[in-house]
From Swiss-Prot:
SUBUNIT field: The system is composed of three essential subunits: KdpA, KdpB and KdpC.
Function: Part of the high-affinity ATP-driven potassium transport (or Kdp) system, which catalyzes the hydrolysis of ATP coupled with the electrogenic transport of potassium into the cytoplasm. This subunit acts as a catalytic chaperone that increases the ATP-binding affinity of the ATP-hydrolyzing subunit KdpB by the formation of a transient KdpB/KdpC/ATP ternary complex.
Residue spans crossing the bilayer: 10-30
Subcellular location: Cell inner membrane
Gene Ontology terms, MF aspect: ATP binding; P-type potassium transmembrane transporter activity
Origin superkingdom: Bacteria
Taxonomic source organism: Flavobacterium johnsoniae (strain ATCC 17061 / DSM 2064 / JCM 8514 / BCRC 14874 / CCUG 350202 / NBRC 14942 / NCIMB 11054 / UW101)
UniProt xrefs under NCBIfam families: PRK00315.1, PRK14002.1
Keyword terms: ATP-binding, Cell inner membrane, Cell membrane, Ion transport, Membrane, Nucleotide-binding, Potassium, Potassium transport, Transmembrane, Transmembrane helix, Transport
Protein name listed in UniProt: Potassium-transporting ATPase KdpC subunit
GO cellular component: plasma membrane
């Protein structure tokens, strides 16, 4: 009986610790973060158009396209495809993406296409592409929007984020918001 009482006390203690105290502590820490843990939003004219850290689908030809998503940009179902480079379905999907890029960008060669433009990230929600991924789209965007190609290229270059660790990236939503403001 003594052991049962000790086990019951331990159970209640861990229940309170992990079901009440720990979540409240994490919630409190999140409230100290920028935007109180609600995510880093991107707004246009006071209206939230998206989140900086979650990719969105852009498939219109007058916008920069982001990295493909294995979950069709559904944040509730964040996941990769779990298909490796030896999977025939995966290889066919990557080839289809390459073919689409080459069709829409006839000035490109297959070797010009960066890998991030044809493969999904582990989360399926990557908001960033490589600078090369953005730069290969400049000619299409300039033509679609009837803008000077140098102006669009300059915009891309101004949106390149240099990290302390890791590769340079371009946030697609931020780039497209800036593109909409470009005249």
């Amino acid at each position: 009986m003594k052991n049962l009482f000790s086990l019951l006390k331990l159970t209640v203690f861990t229940l309170i610790l992990f079901a009440v105290i720990y979540p409240l502590a994490i919630y409190g820490i999140a409230k100290l973060a920028p935007n109180q843990g609600k995510g880093e939003t991107i707004s246009v004219n006071g209206k939230v158009v998206g989140y900086q850290k979650i990719g969105q689908k852009f498939d219109k030809s007058n916008y920069f396209w982001g990295r493909p998503s294995a979950v069709d940009y559904n944040a509730a179902g964040s996941a990769g495809s779990n298909k490796g480079p030896s999977n025939a379905d995966y290889l066919a999907l990557v080839q289809k993406r390459i073919d689409t890029l080459l069709l829409v960008h006839p000035y490109l060669k297959k070797s010009d296409i960066p890998v991030d433009m044809v493969t999904a990230s582990g989360s399926g929600l990557d908001p960033n592409i490589s600078p090369q991924g953005a730069l290969i789209q400049v000619k299409r965007i300039a033509k679609e929007r009837m803008l000077d190609e140098a102006k669009v290229k300059s915009l891309v270059e101004s949106k390149i984020n240099t990290a302390v660790v890791g590769p340079e990236t371009v946030n697609v939503l931020e780039l497209n918001v800036a593109l909409d403001q470009l005249k």
